[in-house]
């Protein structure tokens, strides 16, 4: 099954909802970065949340999420675009903790329970929107829920999950974001709160084969949900040899000549996708000739 995202309304517009399957997306990230189990869960949850938050944007808009906790995994960075493209990495991919709690990996031990979630939105204005909130649990779903409440004043529930096999491969990943609209009735809010207490973990529902639509039906009730739009999502990095050439050219002639004199081969590493772009002396020479 391919990865895709659903945008919906529920309870006659009282609730805005997003749901996504990110199994292939998170699996691609796991393979590229060789993340171990707990690191895979942390990165996967962040990618899943970022994918849905990116889908809240329009056109060429994009956002960057930075999760900086005090755990051994180090900072997590995610870039997400309005078109469904997402990329991301963890600073220390080889982090794992044995055992589980309530059937889930101990993500909070990897992320840490102190620190900040920062979201930078590039929405085409002169200055980006920057929102920040403290980490409240390190489990990430709760941390993004708190971010929406504190930084965007939007009562929300963020559920994100990743199931990882013993060989570190990704079995299932996905999530949902529910946002309460102004004027929502107390009965609606109470119903959602009760349902969220009753449903199994998101990753288990996706492993069972539930689609993004069915995930929303499970939480909100099929008769309450009106699907507005679906869109494909995927791990896709914006780095390319051409873009890196532009960056190298921007260094200027003097610095490029110094690089050519000192290095037999220049390697540029993209942290987001882990690709390594190599430039031989003659490649640097051709760049200098363009100046």
Swiss-Prot record:
Q: Where in the cell is it found?
A: Cytoplasm
Q: Which UniProt keywords apply?
A: Chaperone, Cytoplasm, Disulfide bond, Redox-active center, Zinc
Q: List the disulfide bonds.
A: 237-239, 270-273
GO BP of this protein: protein refolding
Q: Does the keyword Disulfide bond apply?
A: yes
Chief location category: cytoplasm
Q: Name one Pfam family in it.
A: HSP33
Post-translational modification (record) = Under oxidizing conditions two disulfide bonds are formed involving the reactive cysteines. Under reducing conditions zinc is bound to the reactive cysteines and the protein is inactive.
Name any one GO molecular function. protein folding chaperone
- Record's Gene Ontology CC terms? cytoplasm
Q: Which family does it belong to?
A: Belongs to the HSP33 family.
Function per UniProt: Redox regulated molecular chaperone. Protects both thermally unfolding and oxidatively damaged proteins from irreversible aggregation. Plays an important role in the bacterial defense system toward oxidative stress.
Return the protein name. 33 kDa chaperonin
Species per Swiss-Prot/TrEMBL record: Bacillus mycoides (strain KBAB4)
